[in-house]
Regions:
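Cytochrome P450 heme-thiolate monooxygenase catalytic core
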Residues: 2-3, 66-73, 85, 89, ...
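Conserved cytochrome P450 K-helix E-x-x-R motif and the immediately C-terminal K′/meander segment
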Residues: 12-33, 316-355, 376
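Cytochrome P450 catalytic-core helices
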Residues: 253-272, 276-278, 414-431
Length: 471
């Protein structure tokens, strides 16, 4: 029999301690065994607390399929995209989406990433107090929309970002509410439905235009429209699902990991000094602020002058993260400590066994990268921020599962890591950031593990940034 933690209540089960402090509740479970049975209101689930059992779940994705109480609600927003689709659809969808994240495509996207990083770093004033959670969310949203679409047919960049962000925020609320309440025409539901309608219309019009003129525009949607697996292209509706999925998966990962990295570096000024030395030595002015073309006129609705993109990079090359090994390790360590996907679910598609326990078909299975990454048997001193633990370590071969594992490992891992490293390097090149006294930084385990507002004072590094330059 699978052990159960004490404290379960009639009807509620373990819902009270879970809602009170979800992260502490999760970290309390391994003492009861590698598999633990919990109940959250009407939902019964098995929590996997052991690394090898988790790897088995992720490896055997036909048996432990995408699903469960979280994924069913995510599909309401993201549709049947690569992240949310069942095993039966996954291989086909991956063949369509994989080309959009090849190294040569990511190299093209970095031009947009670098411009948005410069825009952000150039928008602050010396001594200004900024909420970097809000600032990085804006930068990540703009960058993602700009890499998805070269042009927006009937709306502006910020309006599109706002619609995506509204859907992501609303999706968590809708996960927690009974499904029938989401159909009531309340103001929040009307705003959510209107935003999704606008985005579906936007993607449909873009895809229709791209099919009529099938040149490669260098963006993600161009790759999806051109994808052809076995002589069959994606339909407009399928492209829409992939766009929703890519934005949802990338937005919080990029913004959150960069915010947590800045927060951790402010707590460890010795490591922050080493990062600044690295970005200075690597000449991050090639991707950062104060470089030729940084304030060139904007040529399209995205704020990206693509015709002059080469002017912003050294010797006409795309920005890269070469030479930023420590900065990359800092981001990786931030993802370990604060994995965006802190709680994920699968569902058994057939009767099976896990850890010598029988699981019937339809069992909800929970696994948590946050839980595994905080286990001392897997990561010595797991609560300590230590980028050096990644020296000479291949993340995919160890206990790190911040981007998943097995056949469903995140296809956009390199994309997300590259953007986070570019953002972090550009900010660290231009600014000293320190926490505003009296402000508390809170973990917010919602749909992803988000930071609450992180207020920091930005002090200019002399001569390395022109403030107020970004519009």
């Amino acid at each position: 029999m699978i052990p159960r933690p004490p404290g379960g209540l009639p009807l509620l089960g373990h819902l009270v301690p879970f809602l009170r402090d979800p992260l502490a509740f999760l970290r309390s479970l391994p003492r009861y065994g590698g598999l633990v049975q919990i109940r959250l209101g009407p939902v019964s689930a098995v929590v996997v607390c052991d690394l090898e059992l988790t790897r088995h779940v992720l490896r055997e994705d036909r048996v432990f399929d995408k699903g469960g109480f979280l994924f069913e609600r995510v599909r309401d927003f993201a549709g049947n995209g690569l992240v949310t689709c069942p095993h039966a659809d996954h291989r086909r969808q991956r063949r369509y989406v994989q080309p959009a994240f090849r190294a040569d495509r990511i190299a093209r996207y970095t031009e947009v990433m670098a411009r948005e990083a410069r825009r952000l770093a150039g928008s602050w004033n010396d001594g200004q107090e900024v909420d970097i959670t809000a600032e990085l969310s804006l930068a990540a949203g703009r960058s993602l929309v700009s890499t998805l679409f070269t042009r927006l047919p009937f709306t502006g960049l910020q309006e599109t970002v706002d619609d995506f962000v509204l859907l992501i925020g609303g999706s968590y609320r809708r996960m927690l509410l009974p499904h029938r309440l989401n159909r009531i025409p309340l103001p929040a539901n009307r705003r959510y439905d209107a935003a999704r309608t606008r985005l579906v219309r936007l993607v449909d019009e873009v895809v229709t235009a791209y099919r009529a003129d099938p040149e490669d525009r260098g963006d993600l949607v161009s790759t999806l429209v051109a994808a052809d697996a076995g002589g069959q292209a994606l339909s407009n509706a399928e492209v829409t699902d992939q766009v929703m999925t890519i934005f949802a998966a990338g937005f919080d990962t990029i913004a959150n990991s960069t915010v947590w990295a800045l927060h951790l570096l402010a707590q460890h000024p010795d490591i922050a000094d080493r990062v600044r030395a690295e970005v200075d030595a690597a000449r991050v002015d090639a991707v950062g602020v104060n470089v030729p073309g940084a304030n060139a006129p904007e040529a399209d609705a995205l704020g990206v002058d693509r015709a002059e993109a080469g002017a912003t990079t050294a010797a006409g090359t795309s920005p890269s993260v070469d030479g930023l090994e420590l900065t990359t390790r800092v981001v990786r360590e931030a993802v370990r400590l604060y994995s965006p996907g802190w709680l994920l679910t699968r569902v058994t598609s057939t009767d099976t066994e896990l850890g010598a326990h029988r699981l019937p078909e339809g069992t909800s299975v929970i696994y948590s990268p946050y839980l595994l990454h905080r286990q001392p048997a897997l990561f010595p001193e797991p609560d300590r921020f230590d980028p050096e633990r990644w020296v000479g370590v291949h993340p995919q071969r160890g206990p790190f599962i911040g981007f998943g594992a097995g056949p469903r490992r995140c296809v956009g891992e390199q994309f997300g890591m590259t953007e986070s490293v570019l953002l972090l390097a550009t900010i660290m090149r231009a600014w000293h950031l320190e926490h505003v006294p009296g402000r508390t930084v809170r973990e917010m385990p919602l749909a992803t593990l988000r930071p609450g507002p992180v207020w920091m004072r930005a002090t200019r590094r002399d001569g390395l940034v022109r403030t107020g330059a970004a519009g």
